[in-house]
């Protein structure tokens, strides 16, 4: 096979050998259901708890705030749909941007078909959200703001802390799709006022 120079790591990454080595025992030896009560479940249960603590530490979060899904798309779907359903008695308005991943945009379309209102913000020539436009888009019935941390096509990093502060000041939940950012730039969910964050291991050699 000829040598390949792979330049699409923003789409997915090669799993690092040490990750394969770390995971292999749970495919071949400690494969018990971690939610079960028998002894065979103890080792995978311990591994999941350790992974949860590690991820929480990397985000400045608490271990009980970390949930595992099958990937970034499910995480995005869950964040938006669960928030919309849980807060629909408070409001039905969601703010996002026109340059989000399809996992966000398609979910917003789904919610619009269910009666929710979605504002899609424009960005400037560099792909950055205009904070003044964000502030203008907020309504009394706004329940969620969802803005990706870093864009998967052009690499723009959004002013997440400032967006989080605006959301927090207005009592609005803030979600960020950080699939392209986690593991590459420092993230502290408390400092950035992030209520929900999506990430995915396959973007960082996992």
How should these model regions be labeled?
Residues 1-206:
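Pyridoxal 5′-phosphate
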């Amino acid at each position: 096979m000829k040598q390949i120079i792979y330049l699409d790591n923003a789409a997915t990454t090669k799993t690092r050998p040490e990750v394969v080595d770390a995971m292999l025992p749970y495919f071949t030896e400690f494969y018990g259901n971690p939610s079960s009560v028998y002894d065979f479940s103890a080792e995978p249960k311990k591994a999941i708890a350790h992974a949860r603590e590690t991820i929480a530490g990397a985000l400045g979060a608490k271990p009980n705030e970390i949930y595992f899904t099958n990937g970034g798309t499910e995480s995005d779907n869950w964040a938006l749909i669960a928030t919309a359903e849980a807060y629909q008695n408070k409001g039905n308005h969601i703010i996002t941007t026109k340059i989000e991943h399809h996992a966000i945009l398609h979910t917003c379309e789904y919610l619009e078909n269910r009666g929710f209102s979605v504002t899609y913000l424009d960005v400037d020539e560099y792909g950055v959200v205009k904070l003044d436009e964000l502030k203008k888009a907020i309504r009394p019935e706004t329940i969620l703001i969802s803005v990706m941390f870093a864009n998967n096509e052009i690499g723009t990093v959004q002013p997440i802390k400032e967006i989080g502060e605006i959301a927090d000041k207005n009592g609005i939940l803030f979600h960020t799709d950080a699939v392209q950012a986690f593991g590459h730039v420092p993230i502290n969910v408390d400092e950035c006022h992030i209520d929900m964050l999506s990430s995915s291991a396959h973007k960082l050699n996992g």
